[in-house]
Amino acid sequence: MEAKAVLRNTPTSPRKMRLVAGLVRGKQVNQAKAILLNSTKAASKNVMLTLKSAVSNYTLNNPDERVSDQELFVKAIFVDGGMTLKRTLPAPMGRAYRIRKRSNHLTIVVDKVKNPVIN
């Protein structure tokens, strides 16, 4: 049984967040945490928080099951565009440039590995 966690309106552009999401897609949770801890991207902190929340949701939804991070994997992770704040920047000759401050919605789904390989 899978569990899901959603982080909404994160003040990071979706393009930057998708770079980090691609690093952990399909990985086991313990591997994904190690990758995110060593990543230099600012978005990796938000992905780590959402991943921990998804694992916690899995344990709460399945109280009779005891699972470790090795037994769970990132089944799906996707980033959607959130709301865009529109701001103006004064430009030469009385004009104004538009600045778009983008945000995103991050969704992570974790599930149990069918045949776990334990080292």
Swiss-Prot record:
Keyword RNA-binding on entry: yes
Disulfide bonds: none
GO molecular function: rRNA binding; structural constituent of ribosome
Subunit description: Part of the 50S ribosomal subunit.
Transmembrane parts of this sequence: none
Cellular-component GO terms for this entry: cytosolic large ribosomal subunit
Ribosomal protein as UniProt keyword: yes
Name this polypeptide is given: Large ribosomal subunit protein uL22
Domain of life: Bacteria
Family note: Belongs to the universal ribosomal protein uL22 family.
CDD domains in alphabetical order: Ribosomal_L22
